[in-house]
Amino acid sequence: MTILTGLMMVLTAQSEIVTALRPAIREAAAKNGVDPVLMEAIIRHESANATSSAARRKNNLAGIMGRRGQRRYESKEACVQDLAELLAKYRSKGRVTLVQISRAYCSSHQHWVRGVSAYMANIRAGKVKEVKPETPKG
């Protein structure tokens, strides 16, 4: 196996972490009245498909900041729920477009809007793999 092949295998495995979170994303989105595709796109963009240091060490898939830097979460699902609540809070303040959300969410909002938009398009086009539930054996 080449180094490149090994790297691609690791990146694919990390990307599948986000895909495996789709049920949690959908549930949190429905509970908070936000778009699950937007949530997944933010998570993929902010965490570089779950490969970022914050995603791996702090379960912070969404780049959510606290008072002392990036927040630490007990689980990735807890971060997903926090993101849904944050987006619902933005919506309640009239921030509904990507540009409006980006101005509150990050400092480099033009880059963020392009990245999140690209992920949203790929998710909606089915270019991001869906994880199928395991079939019980026996």
Regions found by a protein language model. Name each.
Residues 2-138:
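Catalytic cores of secreted/periplasmic lytic hydrolases that degrade extracellular macromolecules
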